[in-house]
């Protein structure tokens, strides 16, 4: 079960390792560095090492483990901060006595779960009941907002059976909490189990994503929505607001569990994001957001190979909580760094490069990642539903959206929120370019908006989007001929588009009144602007100039409403405002008439 190192090239080690399997976890060298077999040629194995290989030399041993890189899943996972291979960073800091991660710290020294922690276990089944893989056996209260459900793991070796023994009481995470008698023998179930990170967890059926994931960001929720179980990408160059966007989603998205994966970002930026996440309060409960969050951090100065593992690790943790019946959101920042790590390892093991040096299987890996999202009927005997939503930022060099990572990502996602440097530099945040962005979920979430907010939602949303497109066309004329060449109708279009941009699309992420924006507030803000557009058209037909309409007191207030009206009084306040807006425009029309 062991071999010897033959040569070392950065994070890649070639070793003579008879019997090795693809993606098997191995320990490299005398200090036992984490590694994973990524290519096999005869008796030779190419290993990507998840730790710094400095000081390794040919001839040192390589030990096989016989199992793939796996996530440890069970209580004490919530609130943890892990590295890319699920080692808890706080524990590593205590062991290392150093802000940098010491090498050779394995799961024996820093286990991902606190196996000695005790919890009050409450059974959900009784002795004699039949259970299937994926069924809930019981639960423990891990944090105030999160109940941790203990599953009969859907592992290949587990078969349906009858509960032989289960009892409530105080148990350690590593204790046996149930025994299930199957045709293959008696299975002892503990509170935790392992799952290979590259293998998607099973489910019965994939359902269409029909319920929107409300994020509190108006541009996202109304114009380019994402559904629970959907996928989204946030590409943008440096300084365009990707990290703030990810922070806003992590704080306000209406998911029960959130997993931010900071993959290959700058250390200082990751530290700032971490400090911010640790201080954040859950707006719905007022308790620390960390009580329903697990964070994975893999900064750019950490070993490059661990970036790839971090994305798979985050997705596996997300699937685990999805299997408990929760709506889960995985936020990856950024997949470009993940792809760069893939490129470096592929080139070092001698694989044929494709476009811009990326491996030919880049589209396949991106598809495997995004396709793990979904709203699904869960494995087990009872009808349960859970969802895993994936939103990932992309960092294209120079903001070039035609580069391979961005262009291939476009093939597999349902919502595209590109960040424009032009908008960011003009201090328009979130800097989502409404002329390039798209969402494939508008049709599927329309039923939810019609039922829960207003049947007019789709009609008004489409009208506002058309006005923004028309504005872009008119701006070309204005640049050449000026506004004097425009008709009153066209001037009105420009005025309305300004209101949409300033009073609806723009949003201050740090203003508690402006962010988050409740669905009813979003709709009524949109309706107020659309009312200005509709009533304004009638006034212009009656001879009222667009410039007069723009100077009305209620119209002047339109861009400020988002900052003045809170979510709890939005329905009453904005309904009154729309009535006063209609009254003032009609009064002006009557006077001019």
Curated annotation (Swiss-Prot):
GO CC annotation: plasma membrane
Entries under CDD domains matching the protein: ATP-synt_V_A-type_alpha_C, ATP-synt_V_A-type_alpha_N, V_A-ATPase_A
UniProt: ATP binding residues: 236-243
GO molecular function list: ATP binding; proton-transporting ATP synthase activity, rotational mechanism; proton-transporting ATPase activity, rotational mechanism
One Pfam entry name: ATP-synt_VA_C
Record keyword Transport present: yes
Membrane topology: Peripheral membrane protein
Catalytic activity from the UniProt record: ATP + H2O + 4 H(+)(in) = ADP + phosphate + 5 H(+)(out)
Gene Ontology biological process terms from the UniProt entry: proton motive force-driven plasma membrane ATP synthesis; proton transmembrane transport
Record EC number: 7.1.2.2
Cellular compartments annotated: Cell membrane
Gene3D superfamilies xref list: 2.40.30.20, 2.40.50.100, Bovine Mitochondrial F1-atpase, Atp Synthase Beta Chain, Chain D, domain 3, P-loop containing nucleotide triphosphate hydrolases
Highest taxon of source: Archaea
Disulphide-bonded residues: none
Key words of the record: ATP synthesis, ATP-binding, Cell membrane, Hydrogen ion transport, Ion transport, Membrane, Nucleotide-binding, Translocase, Transport
Function: Produces ATP from ADP in the presence of a proton gradient across the membrane. The archaeal alpha chain is a catalytic subunit.
Subunit structure, as described in the record: Has multiple subunits with at least A(3), B(3), C, D, E, F, H, I and proteolipid K(x).
Family named by the database record: Belongs to the ATPase alpha/beta chains family.
NCBIfam families attached to this UniProt entry: PRK04192.1
Name this polypeptide is given: A-type ATP synthase subunit A
Organism: Pyrobaculum aerophilum (strain ATCC 51768 / DSM 7523 / JCM 9630 / CIP 104966 / NBRC 100827 / IM2)
Gene that this polypeptide is encoded by: atpA
